[in-house]
Amino acid sequence: DDALWDAFVRQALGGTIFSTSAWLNCAARATDGEAHRIGCFRNGNLIAGLSGLARKRSGLNRLETPELTPHTGLLLAPVQSKGPAKAEAEQHRACELLIDYLEKKYDHVFLVHPPAITDMRPFTWRNWDARLRYTYQIDPSDSEALWDKIERRTRTVIRKAEKLGYALQPTDDVALFRRLYEALYNKQSDGAPVAADTAERFVAAVLKTGLGQAYKIESADGQVASVVVFVNGF
């Protein structure tokens, strides 16, 4: 049920656009997988969940956070009117039930959890591998403060580009995105982290469904320096 799941995502700890049905379906179409959303219910209420893409590779049933998606993974409903110990115990029990299901259903699981999910003990207690990652979160609402945080040399490059007539413009040219993507990674020995056709399909799906917008940096004489895709939050 898309409506039930998406309502849960919006109020859950760790809920972001990347766990919504719309995003998972875009990822499934672009990367050849099937969106799986797994819920833990109590008294008819969804209290915890996991999401990712299911694929079968080398004969193994896999559940994974898809390419070009920062995180899917675990979501937890807020626990009301309970002390921290009781809330923690309730969330751990929900995780145990989800882990039971994962171990029975899939041969391999690789999920990147949202930054808000920090307690991995239910997984490590079951001998799952857990790796710590770090990320940056920036508040874009104050443009002056954001500008002050940019490195000086980057600010210099931006000012120079403005003087040369480069400007930000909306675009829906997915082929342009792919050309620049390939041009960038063709120069690197390791190649692209995600195949160009996959990246192109994903961007096309995101733009078509209204989950994001693309912009190009273009000079007055039509030279495009870069393309960026922004994803809408909620």
What residues fall within each predicted segment?
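A conserved beta-strand-loop-helix scaffold within acyl/acetyltransferase catalytic domains
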Residues: D1-L60, P114-F234
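Acyl-donor binding region in acyl/amide transferases
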Residues: R57-W128, F234
